[in-house]
């Protein structure tokens, strides 16, 4: 069995400065069925939160590729923390009206991880290539629907929201 990242939401109040000392922490806050929920926090030296995230992981049976519930023994090993204060977006992302279809991306070997599918971080890099250079991203949401493999094609859709 393996925990697989299903979705995440990252909020950056500000970006850390080059050489700035920051503290990063993470803690699970809930388990429901085959899903595990985890928060991440980045703080500056004064303890002020500068970035934070929410994530959803699914426990997958490696043999069947189906979701499975964690055992009581597994759950006992986790120390649950408090859910952090943030504006939690819905888990599923709806493509907004007016989103523009981007240029198709052929998946190449450098996009892949050790499991031979696109690495989580590569999806973000691909998405960042679709937005104007120099744009400061303050919030990022990612939803993984299926594994993408070598020589498959990703089709990005781009939409900008003013905040």
Give the residues covered by each predicted segment.
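HotDog/MaoC-like acyl-thioester-processing domains
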Residues: 7-94, 144-153, 159-163
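A short, structural micro-pattern
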Residues: 49-51, 99, 136
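Short amphipathic
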Residues: 99-109
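Active-site helix/loop of acyl-thioester processing domains in fatty-acid/polyketide metabolism
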Residues: 1, 119-137
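A cross-family signal for N-terminal binding/gating loops and helix N-caps
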Residues: 4
């Amino acid at each position: 069995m393996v925990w697989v990242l299903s979705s995440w939401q990252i909020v950056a109040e500000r970006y850390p400065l080059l050489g700035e000392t920051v503290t990063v922490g993470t803690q699970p806050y809930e388990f429901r069925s085959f899903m595990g929920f985890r928060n991440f926090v980045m703080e500056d030296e004064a303890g002020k939160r500068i970035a934070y995230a929410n994530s959803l992981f699914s426990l997958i049976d490696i043999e069947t590729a189906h979701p499975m519930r964690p055992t009581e023994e597994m759950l006992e090993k986790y120390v649950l923390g408090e859910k952090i204060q943030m504006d939690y977006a819905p888990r599923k992302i709806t493509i907004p009206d007016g989103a523009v279809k981007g240029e198709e991306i052929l998946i190449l070997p450098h996009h892949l991880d050790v499991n031979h599918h696109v690495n989580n971080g590569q999806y973000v890099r691909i998405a960042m290539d679709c937005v104007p250079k120099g744009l400061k991203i303050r919030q990022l949401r990612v939803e993984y629907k299926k594994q993408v493999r070598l020589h498959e094609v990703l089709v990005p859709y781009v939409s900008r929201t003013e905040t």
